[in-house]
């Protein structure tokens, strides 16, 4: 069974194409026109061991917001579609990841009940030209389009780059664990019988 997705999202603000393989080797190519965002998406790809081809063209001369949010929407949809009926997945995962002085926690439940709890304090508004508030917008879009309950909390940190990168790496590690198929799980991991 191949757990993959190929799709696109086209609006007046963005044009995005995506190919995702959940059971990959952490390979692919990402080009959104936003250097720091590409670097963070590469963390998800590499540390989540996902194969990801993503090309986005957006109105970044206006703002990065539309591109970042729409990539989150399409990635969330891709994860949901690639997971299919969710049979056999571990479902839950929590990861703590440090990056130098920063430590972040991501906990998730692939439940079909989208939610984002986001508790992050930054030392400023930007990493380079990238507004750090867009990190929350990205993960909200991803959570609500994937059906994932997602909790993100930074324990501490001073450097915005380190804080953001520890979040993306923690998300990647938690996602990798939660989507893993455990042969001991018959059907879906729920007393209701569905997710």
From Swiss-Prot:
GO terms for cellular component: cytoplasm. It catalyses: D-erythro-1-(imidazol-4-yl)glycerol 3-phosphate = 3-(imidazol-4-yl)-2-oxopropyl phosphate + H2O. Belongs to the imidazoleglycerol-phosphate dehydratase family. The keyword ATP-binding does not apply. CDD domains: IGPD. This is Imidazoleglycerol-phosphate dehydratase. The gene is hisB. The lineage of its organism: Bacteria, Bacillati, Bacillota, Clostridia, Peptostreptococcales. Its EC number is 4.2.1.19. Pathway: Amino-acid biosynthesis; L-histidine biosynthesis; L-histidine from 5-phospho-alpha-D-ribose 1-diphosphate: step 6/9. It comes from Alkaliphilus metalliredigens (strain QYMF).
């Amino acid at each position: 069974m191949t757990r993959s997705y190929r799709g696109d999202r086209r609006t007046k603000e963005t044009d995005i194409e995506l190919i995702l393989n959940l059971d990959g080797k952490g390979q692919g190519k990402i080009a959104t026109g936003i250097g720091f965002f590409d670097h963070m998406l590469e963390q998800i790809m590499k540390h989540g061991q996902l194969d990801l081809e993503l090309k986005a063209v957006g109105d970044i001369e206006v703002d990065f917001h539309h591109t970042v949010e729409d990539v989150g929407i399409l990635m969330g949809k891709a994860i949901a579609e690639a997971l299919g009926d969710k049979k056999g997945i571990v479902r839950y995962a929590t990861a703590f990841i440090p990056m130098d002085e920063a430590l972040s926690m991501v906990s998730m439940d692939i439940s079909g009940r989208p939610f984002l709890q986001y508790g992050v304090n930054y030392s400023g508004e930007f990493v380079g030209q990238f507004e750090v508030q867009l990190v929350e917008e990205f993960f909200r879009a991803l959570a609500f389009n994937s059906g994932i309950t997602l909790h993100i909390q930074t324990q501490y940190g001073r450097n915005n780059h380190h804080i953001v990168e520890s979040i993306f790496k923690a998300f990647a590690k938690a996602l990798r664990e939660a989507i893993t198929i455990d042969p001991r799980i018959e059907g879906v991991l729920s007393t209701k019988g569905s997710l």
